Design a protein with these regions (language model features):
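Solvent-exposed, non-transmembrane regions of membrane-associated and secreted proteins
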Residues: 1-140, 158-178
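Alpha-helical transmembrane segments
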Residues: 145-160
């Protein structure tokens, strides 16, 4: 899920948004990044299952070629105005994931706060590399081969698009000169 700057409606339609005024999600001591996303959208999962995340679960953020692993320390439901759990804390590297609840009513917020695990486990680094590898575009090969076979068929069968008639031929036909 891509993370964009800001939390406008347009931003949250594309992916998760970084809450302005909080630390950027780049890690480091005394940082607390807040990432928000929608849930319950028909066209995207985003944070739909955030209510199922529990203490001890882990997630990763890939930023600037580095993989950061976070382990969930607490989950809570708060009113939208309650921001006391989003403050930085001495020497802690925190990320809080936020979405609306109850689904469809959206009167409260789910906060899932996690602390960074250092060093990043090798298994998380390997998983991030594997997920970011783009597969070979086999669809392009299939399209090119299919197009080539069809073109070869038409060429070998002698089927040609009739050439355009010249202007004088058209005028001659109109005058009845053609036999």
């Amino acid at each position: 899920l891509p993370i964009y700057h800001g939390t406008s409606d347009d931003t949250l339609k594309k992916g998760a948004g970084h809450l302005e005024g909080t630390s950027l999600p780049v890690g480091g001591p005394r940082t607390h990044s807040v990432i928000t996303a929608h849930r319950g959208l028909a066209e995207a999962t985003m944070f739909t299952n955030l209510n199922k995340v529990g203490v001890g679960d882990r997630f990763t953020i890939e930023v600037m070629g580095e993989v950061l692993t976070y382990e969930v320390r607490e989950t809570r439901v708060v009113s939208p105005e309650d921001t006391r759990f989003l403050q930085t804390q001495d020497d802690r590297d925190l990320v809080t994931l936020v979405t609306c609840t109850p689904l469809g009513i959206n009167t409260h917020r789910i906060l899932v706060t996690a602390e960074r695990i250092t060093p990043t486990p090798q298994s998380d680094i390997d998983a991030a590399r594997q997920a970011s590898q783009i597969g070979f575009p086999w669809w392009a090969v299939i399209f090119a081969v299919g197009f080539s076979v069809i073109a070869l068929f038409f060429w070998r069968s002698g089927y040609m698009i009739p050439p355009k008639k010249k202007e004088e031929d058209i005028e001659g036909e109109a005058d009845g000169d053609e036999l």
